Amino acid sequence: MDVLELLRVSGSNMYYSTFLADAWCYYISNQITMTMYLYCALGVLSMLFIGWFVYFKRLARLRLRHEIARSLSAVTMASGGDLRGPRFRKRDKMLFYGRRMLRKMKNVSGQMYSSGKGYKRRAVIRFARRILQLRRENMPLEVRTVEPPAEYLEETMEGSDRVPPDALYMLQSIRIFGHFEKPIFLRLCKHTQLLELMGGDYLFKITDPDDSVYIVQSGMINVYISNADGSTLSLKTVRKGESVTSLLSFIDVLSGNPSYYKTVTAKAIEKSVVIRLPMAAFQEVFKDSPDVMIRVIQVIMIRLQRVLFTALRNYLGLNAELVQNHMRFKGSSQGAGPSVYCSQTTRQATGSASATATAAAASGTAGSTHTAVPRPASSLSRYSQDEQHTLSDPNPGIPNLELSGDSVNTLFGEVNGGARLNSYPPLYHQRESDGNLSTRRGSITQQEQPEVGPVPSIDMRLVKSSAVDSLRKELGLPEQDAHIIDPFVEVREMEPNVTLITEGNADDVCVWFVMTGTLAVYQGNADATRIKQDKTDLLIHYVHPGEIVGGLAMLTGEASAYTIRSRNHSRVAFIRRAAIYQIMRQRPRIVLDLGNGVVRRLSPLVRQCDYALDWIFLESGRALYRQDESSDSTYIVLSGRMRSVITHPGGKKEIVGEYGKGDLVGIVEMITETSRTTTVMAVRDSELAKLPEGLFNAIKLRYPIVVTKLISFLSHRFLGSMQTRTTTGAPGAPVEANPVTHKYSTVALVPITDDVPLTPFTYELYHSLCAIGPVLRLTSDLARKQLGMNIFDASNEYRLTSWLAQQEDRNIITLYQCDNALSPWTQRCMRQADVVLIVGLGDHSHLVGKFEREIDRLALRTQKELVLLYPETASSKPANTLSWLNARPWVTKHHHVLCVKRIFTRKSQYRINDLYSRVLLSEPNMHSDFSRLARWLTGNSIGLVLGGGGARGAAHIGMLKAIQEAGIPIDMVGGVSIGALMGALWCSERNITTVTQKAREWSKKMTKWFLQLLDLTYPITSMFSGREFNKTIHETFGDVNIEDLWIPYFTLTTDITASCHRIHTNGSLWRYVRSSMSLSGYMPPLCDPKDGHLLLDGGYVNNLPGHLWRYCRASMSIAGVFPPFCDYRDGHLLLDGCYTNNVPADVMHNLGAAHIIAIDVGSQDDTDLTNYGDDLSGWWLLYKKWNPFTAPVKVPDLPDIQSRLAYVSCVRQLEEVKNSDYCEYIRPLINKYQTLSCAGCPETYGLNPSDLFSEDEDCDGYISEPTTLNTDVRRYQVPRGGNSLSLSETEMDMDSDVEMDLKMERKMDKATQSTPPLQSKAQILRRKHSKEEARHEWEIKREQKQELAREQELERERELSQKGTTAGATGYTPNAVIATQTSLIFMDEEDEMDKKKTKDNDRDEVRGSAEDTGKEKEEDKENRSNTNNETKNYL
């Protein structure tokens, strides 16, 4: 909240309509008198206390004297009355008084718990506690631990003692070729040899045969590369357990082509022992196990593609450098070509080879890994025959093929917008978006309209025969096997610019053989999406006659990463993917020839990189590198998930970031040559590629473009890290560390009990995720159906892992539905999951089952989140969430999900599948809790931040209405000060009517003066004790915890004990809301019960951000007005959050929100101050102030200066939020309302949302320009009627008739504010009649506009459905909706004209009323005052 206006004590301030300012002035004027009275009262009380103390002391002495005298008289009587008789001996005296004292102590101890002096003492203590407020309330239940468990941040230190070191090193080294069964591994071990090298000895030199895999058992080996000028560069240093090998040489050796070292040498740095494994050993194994050979070649091709043709291109900018510029044609293919391929009618000269040839070997690869299911032989043969029959028919009526952005005709038909000919369906029914694909296709420039001409019938037999013979030779098949491929070979003749396959297409992958003409290979610009320019595809290379293309995509089974078009009139022969797989079953050796064709295209640079690359496999919990280790390499995550953890000097560990597939790890530390700043460990089983420092240096020297690419890449990382550090403040975090983004690729779903409807829940979540992008749902039954009943056996582990990796690559998210028991499938789901969702029923028992504990044991480092389901018919809100969380300390986050009735219906599995087969055809509800959960999992959550501003915060109600009408869902809410109160109300109710009602009731309570007067106290810390203020917030929320809210919520307070801001995501709601509203000087800070820290209004450091009411109260602790709120957890004092961050959009972004709407209602400082020179006289200011004939000066007074100093941090944070690219900053028209004018809240609640904004940034009510955060982000469809200015009657939050009457009455009152005051009775009647007519006309126009808006919305839906562009790609962007739905926020021009017309009519009717009598004037005033009073009473 803001204290600028309140602290300015001036007699000219007449706008303070609250008693608070008057009370403050009264205190200042009577301070001396009050202090004197107080000192007198304290003096009297002190004297009474001293007199009471002296009296009792003297009374005790008198009693003691009487006892002594009585004892002496007794002794005298015993001695015969002679005072001079025997005296009272000392020992007898000691015994006597000892017995007396013991007798008294016994009596006192017996009376302590009954009555007497002990009872009085306890009564005094109780009275003192009541006076000094030392009582301690019963503390509510709290979360036991909010920190992650120790295993979550620690690596696994267990070793593999059962395996000998040499066997372990060899096993790890040959894993780059895939998984080998134990018998095959033992056969390979028989061929190993041990080599002992001294320092300086060569392991291999140039011209030595490259036919072995070398594994360092001990010592160190340095690998060098020789340049053309004779100089050498170090590529990498091979240490213990690492290997030296080349995957490309491995394929050469298997293909029968001898390979030699041409530019690479290896020398021992010190005495070393090396294990040598000849590659010929693999040939013997592959003869007996051809299926293993196919698997090994596929693994090699996949890894080469992911690193060489993805990582080096994206991170280093290498394209043309990855392939050879020229390739020698095979004599057999080229010699037989021209005489057979070309005919008199179709022959055309091919273009000259271009020098810009680039990644030819990779043409037709990339994207997601998914292998299509091959068709049966009969269907493929019949399919090919039909296709040949169509081609052999000399029908000239073949349609033209055109290239456009929306619909691209390819060789197989229309890709987008029409049915694709001869395309195979995917493995599963998935809902995918073609938005990215259409963008890539549309970027190819069409030169002329292409046509596909039929092959003349007279040449068809010879052309087909020659094509079969050429493809047979390319595949390495003998002549007698020509009949195997003959049914699958197809021939096409194309005009220029015909697209064979598009980038990202996985259905039309083929092996293409060029017979005549030339094919052009293109690839999308990797920087186009980032720099928003140069979006045309890059020309990679040309494919000439006798060359084959598409082998890499065929071997990897992934989608094509390139677009292939005919450059001129061309004729091609091709075999489809399913046919190749069928041929591969009969002749497995064709994979070697396809792989060899890929390898022959690669440049020497790729081979050198292949020697330097290392492939690393990490099990869950293993460390990639540790903090303070030397950094000599960087890593590329190929699969899995990594976590970066920093260890502080005190031993505390903190998460810095997480890395997923495709991320680069440790590059900044390697380039800067500094030690590792964090420890990086594997969250789950992961695969990485290691790029050493020497390789980077060699590439930088040869290709300077790499330096430019690295600078651009590191600049973006540095900018992102700077925005993160401003809020997190982690000084030791590396620059390239990613924040812990909540974007997962694999999700495991685990039921707590058997009665949890896990299958319907998975279907509902799948339905919501389909609106964001391609998603896949996997169960144990589906896995067995696709891969066989024995797929979960140990022998099939690699096959299952590879298949799951392909599914994960093809989809943005994969759902793993676990079984209800600890089956092998459940264990596999735990190993594959990035996050585990533990699903339970919210109204059932919270006890932890045995199965759930086993799940935690299997995935120690995997993040786990709790999902509690509630029926839609449930009348109560979530409760007892703390019991669920305390029983599961391993849970890091929880979600409350409201479910429809069909989820809890007891049905068989077959009926459930049948039900959701129909449900999946409908559009998901983007406002449902399932959609909110889907956006959270994919990293597309939408956050709403409500800033502080005192009574101006009532405008948040109007903003909530506007957001609701615009169809924008709210996934997370954060607030400060009054924003904490409004945000907590929305998260608790999620109904604008209830929120408005409770907010009005709270505002009415704040305007009751007699309650506030009773709360006044001696202003040492604050003006008010805060007891009544606590009561109003407590009555609003009750004993609700933040954990029980439907929507994730946080509030921000200022901790004056630790001098920082605090973010509250759990605990007592009302307390932290109260603390966030503790404005300094008015309320005492709230004492945090956790640690005893004092918390103030969070707006002092960041003005846009247990039991629920406590933290709400803490967030509203206005310093000086209300006392700081003491946190019941640690005792820290909490104040209003506006002192640190009044609009905590940055905090919301760090909590996982991708798109944020920030609403600022704080006051604006006057920056137009008077320049008074080098010194300032207070007498001169007093003269300027009192002299009405001098020009006024603007000089801040002492309270104003102190207030501005308190808000320095807040202003800086606000500017950063305005300039951020993830936030949409909005400021309504609320400057005319004062910070503490709670009496104006009802008027603010009644404002139309469209009346709160203006397009001028300088004016109050500003909306920042919408920025496009992601061009591929899905824009949800706005609900029908959402684009209309008028409120739909079906969406009215209150009673529609009464609400419209009140709105119309307010508009009429505004129109008549400037009219003359004197009116006759006839004029008053005419004005009322005109009001009714204007109201009727306005309602008619409103209905007409609603109908027109509905018709326009329906028409737009039809157009979108026809174009097929309603599917999304990644998520939802509120900025786009705000940009397109401006009419929902800004004032409608027609409504302005209506109000202006009504105002003019009223002005004309009342004109000439100046001669009316004073009696009529009084009657008119009375009528207007009655009307206003009735309206206010209703509000």
Curated annotation (Swiss-Prot):
Molecular function per GO: lysophospholipase activity; protein kinase A catalytic subunit binding
GO cellular component, one term: plasma membrane
Subcellular location: Endoplasmic reticulum membrane
PTM annotation (Phosphoserine): residues: S443
Active site: S977 (nucleophile), D1097 (proton acceptor)
Binding residues annotated for a nucleoside 3',5'-cyclic phosphate 2, in chain numbering: 474-601
EC number(s) given by UniProt: 3.1.1.5
Top EC class of this enzyme: hydrolase
Biased composition (Low complexity): 361-372
Residue segments, region Disordered: 361-405, 422-452, 1308-1435
Residue ranges annotated as Lumenal topological domain: 1-35
PANTHER family reported for this sequence: NEUROPATHY TARGET ESTERASE SWS, NEUROPATHY TARGET ESTERASE/SWISS CHEESE D.MELANOGASTER
Protein name: Neuropathy target esterase sws
